[in-house]
Design a protein with these regions (language model features):
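Formylglycine-dependent sulfatase
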Residues: 1-277
Length: 277
């Protein structure tokens, strides 16, 4: 959350996301009930806690017998589309219930030249940067919809998920920003030993940090440089998402639908930038 200008970030400038929040409602104290990706996505889809919908890991499908808000809108006459990363059922890119148009891919997808599956049928590589690719597909779908019916467009960005690959435009956007380990990274006295041991593992600040550190664990003072490069790349990917939000905003405005459209910007979870180890 602190990588948004709207959240009083001292280093991030996200004017388009900020505009949505300032012109609408900004939930400053909203919290994710289950911080793992797929369980959280399932909760957004169906409005249930993880212990109710049963998606408790990143490999489980959302149960087809449970309701979802897209299915309800579809029943009410809405045109519905999902475009982007779905991430429930790791190897499944089939079309899901509740969507008239469904474009996704298996697993996490790739930042560049990703292979998408269209409506559970044809798979093809879409050249270019993921964020811009799904934005263009979203615009094309809205242009070709039935103007006489309301619509739901659900976009699933890959960014800013690891591994972090900013587009060239933002690859060096934060090179001059000083980044250090947060102070809370070392406030571990009240935590059990197994927790402290995780500092040297995949998600710990002394671990590989998404491949930005080649030799690990590394507790040397200079290893903070690897951490800093990871955070800079992470923030670079966010800038592209902000551009996408701005493009969709201006597009809706250009076709006269901005004031007739509810724009919801949310996420399945957030990244700890070294906080609490």
């Amino acid at each position: 959350w602190n990588s948004l200008g709207l959240a009083d970030s001292s280093v991030m400038d996200t004017p388009n996301i900020d505009r949505v929040g300032r012109e609408g409602v900004y939930f400053r104290n909203a919290f994710c009930t289950t911080t793992l990706c797929s369980p959280s996505r399932a909760s957004i889809l169906g409005g249930l806690y993880a212990h109710s919908h049963g998606v408790v890991n990143n490999f489980t499908e959302y149960p087809v017998d449970l309701p979802t808000f897209p299915r309800q809108l579809q029943k009410a006459g809405y045109q519905t589309a999902y475009i982007g990363k779905y991430h429930m059922g790791e190897k499944n890119d089939d079309k899901r219930p509740g969507f008239d148009y469904f474009v996704t891919h298996q697993g996490q997808g790739k930042y560049f030249d990703n292979v998408f599956c269209f409506n559970g049928g044809e798979r093809k590589m879409v050249k270019g940067y993921y964020t811009h690719a799904i934005t263009k597909m979203a615009v094309d779908w809205v242009k070709n919809r039935d103007d006489d019916r309301p619509f739901l467009l659900y976009m699933g960005h890959k960014a800013p998920h690891s591994f972090y690959y900013p587009e060239p435009k933002y690859e060096h956007a934060f090179d001059d920003v000083d980044i250090r380990y947060p102070l809370t990274a070392f406030h571990l006295e009240d935590n059990p030993d197994w927790y402290k041991a995780r500092l040297d593992t995949w998600h710990g600040i002394y671990g590989p940090i998404f491949d930005y550190r080649k030799e690990f664990p590394d507790r040397r003072a200079q290893s903070v440089l690897d951490f800093a490069n990871m955070v800079r790349a992470y923030r670079g990917t966010i800038k592209s998402v902000d551009d996408s939000v701005g493009y969709m905003y201006e597009f809706l405005k250009s076709i006269g639908e901005l004031d007739n459209t509810m724009i919801i910007y949310t996420t399945d979870n957030g990244l700890l930038e070294g906080e609490h180890g």
